[in-house]
A protein has these predicted regions:
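Conserved active-site and cofactor/substrate-binding residues in soluble primary-metabolism enzymes
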Residues: 2-5, 95, 152, 156
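N-terminal FAD cofactor-binding segment of flavoenzymes
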Residues: 1-29, 108-111
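Rossmann-like flavin
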Residues: 35-131
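Short acidic-hydrophobic surface loop/beta-edge motif
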Residues: 30-34
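A short mid-domain helix/strand-loop element embedded in enzyme catalytic domains
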Residues: 11, 131-135
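Generic, ordered loop/turn and secondary-structure boundary motif
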Residues: 2, 23-26, 41-43, 124, ...
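Helical element adjacent to the flavin cofactor pocket in flavoenzyme catalytic cores
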Residues: 136-162
């Protein structure tokens, strides 16, 4: 929701940046928790996301940085995510064909880190085997960069658009 981010552009286009009350979430706005009591946080910028996860998985620093860089690269491949109207670059077909699971599994053998990186799949009901990496990238990027909530509830968006 910060200026220059995809959601800000969309909400501004629909006139929602002035009429809906927004609140930025805390820096570590979400957490992935496991039955064993371990908790891992998602932070609200890619640099903080990396820093937070590297603190939890120091031996996986390269994998975490690679994940972050790949997400950001994938998002730039899809110009509509930033309301830039240009041709989609189909030359990087690997991006279109690769599943999110295959991408994440290729980064690390650490099962817990794999689960943490895939944790946002619930946001879009992503099926591990079927969800394309680019869908995971677009959702994860929006989630990490636009950690805001509607102060008076999400229904105000529907009311404003009606």
């Amino acid at each position: 929701m910060d200026e220059g981010q995809a959601l800000h552009s969309y909400f501004k286009y629909f006139g929602l940046t002035e009429t809906v009350k927004w609140k930025k979430m805390d820096a570590e706005f979400d957490q992935i928790s496991f039955d064993d009591g371990s908790v891992f946080h998602h932070a609200s910028s890619w640099s903080e996301f990396e820093k937070t996860l590297i603190a939890d998985f120091p031996e996986e620093a390269d994998a975490i940085r690679s994940y972050s860089a790949a997400i950001q690269k994938a998002v730039k491949t899809f110009p509509l995510d930033e309301l830039k109207f240009s041709e989609l670059d189909h030359t990087d077909s690997e991006l279109l064909d690769l599943s999110a699971k295959a991408f994440i599994d290729g980064l690390t053998q650490n099962e817990k880190l794999r689960a943490v990186l895939a944790g946002s799949n619930l946001l879009y009901a992503g099926s591990a085997e079927k969800c394309p990496f680019y869908v995971h990238a677009l959702v994860s990027n929006g989630y990490v960069l636009s950690a805001y909530k509607c102060l008076d509830g999400g229904s105000q968006i529907a009311k404003e658009l009606a």
